Amino acid sequence: MAHKKAGGSTRNGRDSNAQRLGIKCFGGELIPAGSIIVRQRGTKFHPGKNVGCGKDHTIFATVKGKVEFKKKGIKKRTYINIVR
């Protein structure tokens, strides 16, 4: 009688979809107004000149120009600017 008894089921085997976070436009890149520069959770990058911040902390360009990453302040925060 070489039979197997019914195996128990597992409660694993699921995974969530990737959130597609990260930098979308890098320093020195020329981008149009409205382009998403960074998608992030919290303010890892802070908005600078000619840049807006969405309610989910997405940083986007408000004008056409070149992307610039700058560290400033005592805490060395990274600010993103758009230089025309």
Swiss-Prot record:
GO biological process annotation, one example: translation
GO cellular component: cytosolic large ribosomal subunit
Keywords: Ribonucleoprotein, Ribosomal protein
Annotated disulfide bonds: none
Database matches in Pfam families: Ribosomal_L27
Classification via InterPro entries: Ribosomal_bL27, Ribosomal_bL27_CS
GO terms assigned for molecular function: structural constituent of ribosome
Family under the similarity heading: Belongs to the bacterial ribosomal protein bL27 family.
NCBIfam families reported in the protein's UniProt record: L27
Protein name as annotated: Large ribosomal subunit protein bL27
Gene from which the chain derives: rpmA
